[in-house]
From Swiss-Prot:
Main location class: cytoplasm
Upper lineage: Bacteria, Bacillati, Bacillota, Bacilli, Bacillales
Assigned EC number: 4.2.1.11
TM segment ranges: none
Source organism of this protein record: Staphylococcus haemolyticus (strain JCSC1435)
Name of the protein: Enolase
Gene: eno
GO cellular component: cell surface; extracellular region; phosphopyruvate hydratase complex
Pfam hit, one: Enolase_N
Amino acid sequence: MPIITDVYAREVLDSRGNPTVEVEVLTESGAFGRALVPSGASTGEHEAVELRDGDKSRYSGKGVTKAVENVNEIIAPEIVEGEFSVLDQVSIDKMMIQLDGTPNKGKLGANAILGVSIAVARAAADLLGQPLYKYLGGFNGKQLPVPMMNIVNGGSHSDAPIAFQEFMILPTGAESFKEALRWGAEIFHNLKSILSERGLETAVGDEGGFAPKFEGTEDAVETIIKAIEKAGYKPGEDVFLGFDCASSEFYENGVYDYTKFEGEHGAKRSAAEQVDYLEELIGKYPIITIEDGMDENDWDGWKQLTDRIGDKVQLVGDDLFVTNTEILSRGIEQGIGNSILIKVNQIGTLTETFEAIEMAQKAGYTAVVSHRSGETEDTTISDIAVATNAGQIKTGSLSRTDRIAKYNQLLRIEDELFETAKFDGIKSFYNLDK
């Protein structure tokens, strides 16, 4: 039977050694689902609230016992006593949203609500004897995503003196996900050897990318291009580049202040100058995607950027849209960006996540399913990417098990789909004039 008989949460650790929420759901027939909730380092101010305890004597205030308590003492009784079916995802998600009663899930915590939402879906898939991607996407989910591999970390994700948070490679010329992953791994290892030859640090940051002390942004880009070529691939043909500027991290009082991360070598740019700078970079290098090129509240700047280069480059809103359909709807109406980053914990339920993806795709925007810098062994985002035919996934570099787990899950899915599996490569960027 599909009736949920038990919902239980506990405090566990994420990839940074910080507490996070794990939730387990059990049905009367024995179907079981478990979910672990990710956490971000650079967060948009409009994100759903991640509930932390604030008790400095425990995990430096980052404990999640209150969120765990909210699952065990508030959400669980509602679900169990209400005799909810594990197959009724939308009703359960809506019930939790109403139970919280705030616009940002600040009462119960998005980390509490999301853990339950995903665990319910996993238990439903288990009940039906289906893989999660098939339960979520039905027979239509068969497109493997182009991986955006964050092989150099800057900004808030490392100690490197570079403002941009992520430098990514996208193996769009590969014929399958398996091949794209191999290309990425080969480029990653070639980059490591180039860094070693230069006497640069090869330790990795939160998302598994290198965080060496490059001389600046262009040094990082040119070094990545050398690694692509050394691995035997052609930049701008086999493999493209991407940035996550995370501009909100260095924007203040109308100024994009690169000195925050780059010291005396950094520039201070107005919105117009920031647009000029990004346009200059895409003219010089094979860049296909830029995330958060402008501050989340600089909508005028975003409009300038979209009008200037939005037909040539994917412009992804992360802090801008925070997986929120209300904000995305406004962006679509005003012609802001052409893509949304999808992070399940920014909004807090699977139902709302799928609504955001559907809205984006209907408007001709791409949807990039993404991890967070604080991750776990949970691989739900891999299944979501395939279930929704998102076409793109961002889940870190080619090291650290918390990142590789997602890639390995995609390999399994591709194997399972066999001849029905699709990998569209460059065609996944249907929002551009290619």
